[in-house]
């Protein structure tokens, strides 16, 4: 287990009190106008199904260009669906063309942000003139750690995605990468002024192994396959993650209407991250209903 550290944390009993979550990652689907009709339909279908929002949180992850439309609709119609972004910059501001800062996402009332998704990790890191970019170039775990800290600073809950980079990877390799991200996070946190300056007085620091984030386990062999990983492997991974640090764990990869309930209702899991099966509001509502019966 990693040594005690000063990280942004939640109260010690928070995880036992928090509800499970079903999240839909839209990826590069559904434009800003479609997002409005999608959320309206999903909301009334959930209400019509008698969904208990106090027992199970529903969240969606639209493309960046949809977020303002989603924010406006959720606020105006008092919709009880959470939302977040699919990625965030490792930098707070500056000359970083095409990147979106955590504070920009906070200004759009994002509750969550996905970090380290396998479809992002496979993108090449291009070198730049900025020394900070060069330092992070080809160091994905360090980059991810910086994104986590920017999210903490903005008051957004990150969902750290971990999994084998290739189907040939093993259980221990996935956990090794998770430990590597945490080690980078600790190293950055220990640098003079880096955390205090970034987070100011908004976040308290305690010696704790409980991070204010979620972890989504997404094995590459299951993503976009339509088939979940073996339930035994999922539970084993969730237990191992929670043994390293006290976080809520989601499962993602091949989740669909027919397997979602079995995965969602595993005792060690705190929810599921759904991809393709969340792109149709009616289908997603049906999936949610099967999980929450």
Curated annotation (Swiss-Prot):
Instruction: Name a single GO cellular component.
Output: cytosol
Q: Which InterPro entries match?
A: Aldolase_TIM, TIM_sf, TrioseP_Isoase_bac/euk, Triosephosphate_isomerase, Triosephosphate_isomerase_AS
Q: Could you say which protein family the record assigns here?
A: Belongs to the triosephosphate isomerase family.
Q: PROSITE patterns, per this entry?
A: TIM_1, TIM_2
The record describes its quaternary structure and partners as: Homodimer.
Top class in the EC scheme:
isomerase
Per its UniProt entry, which superkingdom is the organism in?
Bacteria
Catalytic residues at 117, 218
Q: Which HAMAP family match?
A: TIM_B
Q: In which pathway does it act?
A: Carbohydrate biosynthesis; gluconeogenesis; Carbohydrate degradation; glycolysis; D-glyceraldehyde 3-phosphate from glycerone phosphate: step 1/1
Q: Which UniProt keywords apply?
A: Cytoplasm, Gluconeogenesis, Glycolysis, Isomerase
The protein here is known as: Triosephosphate isomerase
Q: Name one GO biological process term.
A: gluconeogenesis
Q: Which PANTHER family is this protein grouped with?
A: TRIOSEPHOSPHATE ISOMERASE (PTHR21139:SF42)
Molecular function via GO: triose-phosphate isomerase activity
